[in-house]
Amino acid sequence: MTATAKSQGPLFTKRALFTLIWPLLLEQTLSVTMGMADTLMVAGVGEAAVSSVSLVDSLNILIIQILSALATGGAVIASQYLGRRDEENASRSAAQLYSVLGISTVAVGVVCLLLSRLILRMVFGSIDEDVMRFAQQYFLISAVSYPFIGLYNGGAALFRAQGNSRISMLASLVMNVINIAGNALLIYGFGMGVIGAALATLIGRVFAAVFILWQNQDLHNPLRVQHFADLRPRRRPIMQILSIGIPSGLENGMFQIGKLCVSSLTSTLGTSAIAANAVANSVSTLANIPGNTMSLATIPVIGQCLGAGEKKQAQRYSVMLLGIAITGLAVTNAALFFLMPEVVTWFNLSAEASAMCTHVVHWFNLFSIFFWATSFTLPNALRAGGDAKFTMSVSIVSMWLFRVILSYIFVLQFHLGLTGVWFGMFIDWICRSLCFLVRFARGKWMEHKVI
C-alpha cells in the first residue's frame, strides 16, 4: 500500500486504510487477550508468582521498548522512502535495521544474563525472597528471548511501513498461540510454574522471529534484503535510523525507567498492591486496544504522506486516525467500566487486591477516554515527520515531573496508596496532551528533513 500515482489525489483510500487497520486491530486484540491469559495462568501459581512476573515484565518492557525505538526509526525511514517511490533505498534501510537490531539485542541479552541478580536488586531493592527467586528465574530466560523479539519487532514495523499489516498480525498470532499452548503444557502439565511461563514466551518469540524473517524474503516484498552484503553496517542509513531511533529510545527508556521507579514505590505497598497493580495494568490494556491500533497505523500513513511531500494530507490523516482512536477508546473504556467487577474475579486475587484493582481501573477508564490518544497516538504523527526530539523532551519532562514525583508525593505525603500512583500517571497524560496538541496545530513537526 504505497502512494498512488497522482500525488494530488488521496494517498490512502478508505479501503486502503481499512486494509491496514483491521489486521492491526486483530493483532492488538490477540496480544492483549493472550497477555491476560498469560497472567491468569501464572496467577494459578500464587500471588508471589504474579508479583515476580509483573516486576520483571516492567524491566523487560524497559529493555524491549528501548530496542523497539530502533524499529520505529527504521519504519519511519522506510515509509518515507516508499512514499517517495525509492524502493532501493527503502530496502537498504530495512537491511540496516535488521543489522542494528541483531547486534544491539544480543549485546543487551548477554549483559542481562551475566548480571541478572545484581540488576534485579538495583531496580527493585528488598522484596520478598520468594518473589526474588521467581523473578530471577523469569528474567534469565527472558534475556535469551531479546534478540528474537527485537528481530520480530523490526520485521513487523517494516511490514506495517509498506501497509502490509497482515503479516505482522499472523506473526503475532503464531507467537501468542505458541505462548498460551506452552503455558498450558509447561505450567499445568509439567508443573514448571514461572519457569514454564518464561520458556513458553521464549519459544513463541523464536517462532515469530523466524516466521517474519522468512516472510521478509518474499520476492514481492519491496523491503526484502536483496543482497547479504546489504546487512553490512553502513553509516548513512544507520544515522538516518538513529536520528529517529535514539530520541525515541531515550524517550522510551526514560519513560520505562520512570515506571520502574513507580514500580519500586508500588512494591513498598505490599504483595496485594503489587498483584492489584499487575492485574490493573493487564486489564487496562484491553481498553487501550483502539488507541494502540491507531498508533501503529499512524507511522506508515503519515510517513508515506510526508515522503511524498503531501503535508496537508499528513495533517488530515493524523486528525482522522486520532478521531478513530478517541471514539474506539470511549467504547472500550465504557464497557470495561461496567464489566470490571466481574473481570477482576478471573485473577484469583485476595479481596483486598480485588478492591484496589477495581478502584484504579475505574479511574483509568474515565481519564483514558479524554487523554490517552492525544498522549500516545498523536505523537506518532510527530515522529513520522521526524519530530522525535520534541516528543522525547515532552515525554521525559512530563514523566519525571508529574508521574514519578507526584506519585511519591501522593503515596508518601498524602498516603493515597495505589490510587496515588495512578493519579500521578493521569496528570502526566494531561500535560503530554496539551504539549502535543499545540505542537501539532503549529505544523512545525512537518518541516524536518528525514531522508
Stretch-by-stretch model annotation:
Residues M1-L24, A78-S145, G189-I246, I302-S368, ...:
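Short alpha-helical transmembrane segments in multi-pass integral membrane proteins
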Residues Q8-L40, G44-V45, I61-G73, I77, ...:
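N-terminal transmembrane alpha-helices
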Residues T19-D38, I141, M175, G204-A208, ...:
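Transmembrane helical elements of multi-pass membrane transporters/channels
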Residues T29, T33-S51, L120-E129, L185-M192, ...:
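Helix-terminus/linker motif at the lipid-water interface of multi-pass membrane proteins
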Residues E47-S58, A135, F139, A198, ...:
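Small-residue hotspots at the loop-to-helix junctions and early N-terminal turns
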Residues V50-V110, I149-S168, I274-M340, F371-S395:
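Small-residue-rich hydrophobic transmembrane alpha-helices
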Residues L62-Q65, N179-N183, A209-L213, L286-I289, ...:
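Hydrophobic transmembrane alpha-helices of multi-pass small-molecule transporters
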Residues A71, I141-R160, S168-N176, A197-I212, ...:
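Short runs within selected transmembrane alpha-helices of multi-pass transporters and secretion channels
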